[in-house]
From Swiss-Prot:
This is AMP phosphorylase. HAMAP family: AMP_phosphorylase. It comes from the Archaea. Belongs to the thymidine/pyrimidine-nucleoside phosphorylase family. Type 2 subfamily. GO terms for biological process: AMP catabolic process; pyrimidine deoxyribonucleoside metabolic process; pyrimidine nucleobase metabolic process. GO terms for molecular function: 1,4-alpha-oligoglucan phosphorylase activity; AMP binding; pentosyltransferase activity. It comes from Methanothrix thermoacetophila (strain DSM 6194 / JCM 14653 / NBRC 101360 / PT). AMP binds at G166, S192, R193, A194, I195, T196, G197, T201, S262, K286. Catalyzes the conversion of AMP and phosphate to adenine and ribose 1,5-bisphosphate (R15P). Exhibits phosphorylase activity toward CMP and UMP in addition to AMP. Functions in an archaeal AMP degradation pathway, together with R15P isomerase and RubisCO. The active site is at D254. SMART domains: PYNP_C (SM00941). Transmembrane segments: none annotated. NCBIfam families: AMP_phos (TIGR03327), ARCH_P_rylase (TIGR02645), PRK04350.1 (NF003338).
């Protein structure tokens, strides 16, 4: 038996640490697997060794393993074999087709933390270089669904929405969910937090209400009020996806077949019958051309058909932010204002009604081609606002909150136009970087207000942006980013007059 020394450090996998003398006595090396047992619990962990941190007869156990070992005081340790899934990952590297059982084995080992970070990286890299075929992608999706919690609804149809992302200010779920729920359809929207953006849908909803719920609670709220906006990471829905996303982010790659499976596994796990996929398209987005978007749309609809889920994809304009705000509180205030009045930025209104309308048609509430009008009626009548307040209350928020009640960062700075002219370029990536420098999404009150968008007339000295932050130093960092100029960076907004350049360039040109 080894005395347990808990390490209060989360590392995303099961890992233990032995004194080097104990490891040598057992014939173990760093990176080997060991079976760790205590009364009522056991798991397989990756071994690390030390000469000083842990004494002989002791074992250091990191947070994830310590928690699942029921915070045991002592444990037994023995050598464990390598998972068979490692050989299947090598098969993928060698371009060999995998069977359904082999794919299920890989996913199971990902879920149960049986793969080291290096082995997981090898799987992701192999998937990136050698895409899975449609059959393998279906098996991967089903395995991701089956290894986590699932929600089964008694009432149908159940509809859902997903966005490919890449566009700042894409707050449309804050309108789509209440519009669809107000129509009588069920929409259990599980969403992500921002990883590289200025605010995911879960970050936005958290301005109004808690977003961390179990799968059973998501089902209960959805069946009670028609919809929910929850953080998927708080559930055990498609748990393999969370670990894969973290590794993909570290490697800065996004394997295509893995992306397809990730999208559809989450939707299949919540019991969706129909899904609309928002596909922002244009320069600076993940789908820069309509051709790329159409390929993805076909693959998603084909995968949905294999899984028994009806999928429709909507290619949307992604060349500039949706609405005129970026950052959680600012975006929620803008969305809530539109729900209260039915009016607001055209890009936000049009996109929200278009996506909601597609879901109303897919759910049988509206005839083909009539969904937009039906969604607009729900918005203008105030039904969508009332439904969002029901959802907010069901999730533990204040149902009486108004848009003007939402606080934004008190430290603010306007970025002014240097000249008369028109907005001729708008760089989404730079807007996101500025909002993050101001503190978003961690600081819910931080972000950017956009005063001028593509094609709009602007006079010298008029505000282009207002940056909001809760601290002076973050505001200063964000303001500095607006004026950065080098070969690799673009300003967030480019303003040009009608005269772009004069030639020849002499100070006193010749006269006739």
């Amino acid at each position: 038996m080894f005395e347990v020394v808990p390490f209060d450090i989360e590392i995303g996998q099961y890992k233990v640490m032995l004194n080097i003398a104990d490891a040598r006595a057992m014939g173990l090396n760093p990176g080997d697997r060991v079976r760790v047992r205590t009364r009522g619990a056991s798991l397989t962990a990756i071994l690390d060794v030390t000469g000083q941190m842990i004494g002989q007869g002791q074992v250091g156990i990191f947070t994830e393993a310590f928690r699942d070992l029921k915070e045991a005081k002592s444990v037994e340790i023995s050598p464990a074999p390598r998972p068979a899934s490692i050989s299947y990952i090598k098969m993928l590297m060698d371009r060999q087709k995998l069977s359904e059982d082999q794919i299920r084995s890989i996913v199971r080992d990902i879920v149960y933390n049986n793969l080291s970070e290096i082995e997981l990286s090898a799987y992701i890299t192999a998937s990136y270089i050698h895409n899975l075929d449609p059959q393998e992608t279906e098996w991967l999706t089903r395995a991701m669904i089956e290894t986590g919690e699932r929600i089964y609804f008694d009432k149908h149809p159940v509809v859902d929405k997903h966005s490919i992302g890449g566009v700042p200010g894409n707050k449309v779920s804050m309108l789509v969910v209440p519009i669809v729920a107000a129509s009588g359809l069920l929409i259990p929207k599980t969403s992500s937090r921002a990883i590289t953006g200025a605010g995911g849908t879960a970050d936005l909803m958290e301005v109004l209400a808690p977003v961390e719920f179990t799968a059973d609670e998501i089902k209960e709220i959805t069946e009670t009020v028609g919809g929910v906006i929850a953080w998927g990471g708080a559930t055990n829905i498609a748990p393999a996806d969370d670990r894969l996303i973290k590794a993909e982010y570290a490697l800065a790659i996004d394997p295509y077949s893995q992306m397809l499976a990730s999208i559809m596994a989450k939707k299949g796990a919540v019991g969706a019958d129909a899904v609309v996929v928002d596909m922002p398209t244009g320069p600076g987005t993940k789908l820069e051309t309509p051709e790329k978007a159409r390929v993805l749309a076909k693959d998603l609809t084909d995968l949905g058909e294999r899984l028994g889920i009806r999928v429709e994809c909507a290619m949307t304009f992604g060349g500039s932010p949706v609405g005129r705000t970026v950052g959680p509180a600012l975006e929620v205030r803008e969305a809530l204002k539109m729900l209260e009045t039915g009016e607001g930025p055209n890009s936000l209104r049009e996109k929200s009604l278009a996506l909601a309308g597609i879901l109303l048609e897919m759910g049988g509430v509206a005839a083909r081609g009539e969904g937009y009008r039906a969604a607009e009626e729900i918005l203008v009548s105030g039904k969508a606002h009332r439904k969002l307040m029901e959802i907010v209350e069901a999730q533990g928020g204040d149902p009486k909150i108004r848009s003007e009640d939402i606080q934004i960062g008190e430290h603010q700075k306007q970025i002014l136009s240097p000249t008369n002219g028109y907005v001729v370029a708008f760089y989404n990536k730079r807007i996101i970087e500025i909002a993050r420098a101001a503190g978003a999404p961690g600081d819910k009150r931080a972000g950017v207000i956009i005063h001028k968008k593509m094609g709009e007339i602007v006079k010298k000295g008029e505000p282009l942006l207002t940056i909001c932050s809760s601290t002076d130093w973050e505001l200063e960092c964000a303001v500095k980013m607006c004026s950065m100029r080098d070969a690799l960076e673009q300003p967030p907004i480019v303003v040009e007059g009608m005269l772009l350049e004069r030639y020849p360039t002499e100070r006193y040109p010749r006269t006739i």
